[in-house]
Amino acid sequence: MRFKLLCAVIVAVSLCSCSAAADFANGPADSITMPPGNRVSQTLLAGDKLVTFRSWLDIPYVKNPVEPEYQRLNIYVPEEYFHGETINGYTAKTAPILMPNGVGGYLPGKQFIPANDTRHGTPNVALYALSKGYVVISPAIRGRTLENGKAPALIVDYKAAVRWVRHNKDRLPAGDTEKIISDGLSAGGALSSLLGATGNAKEYEPYLQAIGAEEERDDIFASVVYCPITNLENADMAYEWIFNGVNTYHMGPAREMDDNMKAASDALKAAFPAYLNSLELEGYELDDDGDGSFKEYIEGLYIAAAQKALDAGENVLGLEWLEVDEDEGKVTGVDLEEYAEWATRMKAAPAFDSLNMKSFENNEFADAHFTAYAFEHSTAEKPAMADADKIYVMNPMNFIGKEGVSTAKYWRIRHGVKDRDTSLAIPAILALKLKQAGYDADVAAVWNVPHDGNYDLPELFEWLDGICKK
């Protein structure tokens, strides 16, 4: 009976929401106000907790949208804040604002909608956040398949949404605009890292002005980053540093790399140490063979993931790439070559800037190369090189520690042990550069997890509460 009643409430409330949301969305972006006296709410079951919240949908966040269907956002506010109540120690004024993005594969991303995630068997990040007292504001974002969605459209939109939130801070019914948190996975993780790294960077200003973004700050408090497909102009080298020697790839049916791909793998692996060393990460380097303290650091991340799983009672034995002292209950070593065989290669070399210029990432750069190696060895009929300025603004590494940029203070970066969409080296490098620049970066590999995100919500929100309540 309780389930039937709840479903009826959800349906009825959802139908009413559309009208109120439409009232909120009418008019130019700079004249939007919260509808006075709005009592429309939704109720969903998050685990064993009923969560009631108000919704405003499809609000334009720029004055001159070039893709109006996407340059809109949704706002979700816990009902308790309309009655002067607290949730999880937060009030309407102190509630953090979670801004998750729905981008994947550099495709257009729709707004997150609070719901239960059938894949993980848990509430999704938006619903879970509401249950913990967070305000959720989720923008839709342009992507590579739209006429006006090529790089750097997605980060421009994300920034514009943050600016809209700050511009309307006195109109929002709840939420602390100095506690804005980004969240994303895969290309969305790259986007989350870009938003966190590039706060107020002047390089984006012409793009923001062109779409009529508000003249506000776009720095944020914290970035949540899962398996980011980022640092694209160096990601091919990092991928081959791990997967060189594994010549079968699994993008669809298993296939063997051809001679051009194998040659690319060898060359890119050989080039990675020079790139890593050029970053001058204190205490981390590689020799010409790709060995050294940075390799030991990567091995340590895998060891820590396995140890955490072992301590939790999971079986990590019987893997050729993992050394375990069963008597002591300690994971003692990792063989990265054996790891690559076990994980399997997903992508042929080059993994991101493909020689035929047909990867998702090539498409993101308007069907062009973005690395010197792929451009010089291109098999495309008409090779093209992406604009250098656009390549630059798509890489968060270029902005960490840069004068005039306000990088997020707090970072949580996760990469699954079974993930072979990109190399663990990429998020690890991001975290090390952040730490060296004085930022708080919590990075870890996660046992038995593939290319995925928001799979550890209790741990995530324990971390978020820890930084938000300081």
Annotate the PLM regions:
Residues 22-89:
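Catalytic-loop region of hydrolases
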Residues 149-171:
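Alpha/beta-hydrolase active-site loop
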Residues 73, 89-106, 110:
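Short beta-strand element of the alpha/beta-hydrolase
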Residues 167-242:
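Primarily recognizes the serine-hydrolase "nucleophile elbow" in alpha/beta-hydrolase
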Residues 16-17:
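C-terminal motif of bacterial Sec signal peptides marking the signal peptidase cleavage site
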Residues 314-469:
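C-terminal subdomain of alpha/beta-hydrolase-fold enzymes, centered on the catalytic histidine
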Residues 226-344:
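Non-catalytic, alpha-helical, charged scaffold/linker segments
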Residues 114-136:
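Short amphipathic alpha-helix adjacent to the substrate-entry channel of hydrolases
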